[in-house]
Amino acid sequence: MAEIEQSMIDEMKDGFPLFDNKGDGKIDGAQLGDVLRSFGLNPSNAEVEKIAKANEGKRLSFDDYLAIHKQVLGQGEVGSYEDFFEGLKLFDKEGTGLISGAELRHVLATLGEKLTEAQVDELMAGGGGQEDAEGNVNYDTFAKYLMLG
């Protein structure tokens, strides 16, 4: 299980009561995604659904939550620039460093952790996803943009 610095545990302990809607020092299992994200984690929707289902109908103490937080923390890191670059490069059939903006939108909306149309629009409108005059996106720039967070 991943280790968490004591200062972070103290910070989470201070913030935990904000999610306690019954005043019993516990949170609903259905709130786990929100609580995890508020304390700096970014679990996938699939991870949140799995955890929420396992804790459906339960009220979780801070210690219960902390164990789940450590579990999610230890499940992996965000991909590296190289991971994103190599993944996007697969769609560059001509080896030009460009992929179709429409194809990129399709990939973002349908593969892996599927994004909504609004999320895709937000990513594409950002600095890295802008299409050139021919509707192509430089995937090196896009991968770098993704790594900026």
Curated annotation (Swiss-Prot):
GO terms for molecular function: calcium ion binding. Keywords: Motor protein, Myosin, Repeat. PROSITE patterns: EF_HAND_2. Residues 7-42, 79-114 form the EF-hand domain. InterPro entries: CALM/Myosin/TropC-like (IPR050230), EF-hand-dom_pair (IPR011992), EF_hand_dom (IPR002048). It comes from the Eukaryota. SUPFAM superfamilies: EF-hand (SSF47473). GO terms for cellular component: myosin II complex. Myosin is a hexamer of 2 heavy chains and 4 light chains (two regulatory light chains and two essential light chains). This is Myosin, essential light chain. The lineage of its organism: Eukaryota, Metazoa, Chordata, Cephalochordata, Leptocardii.
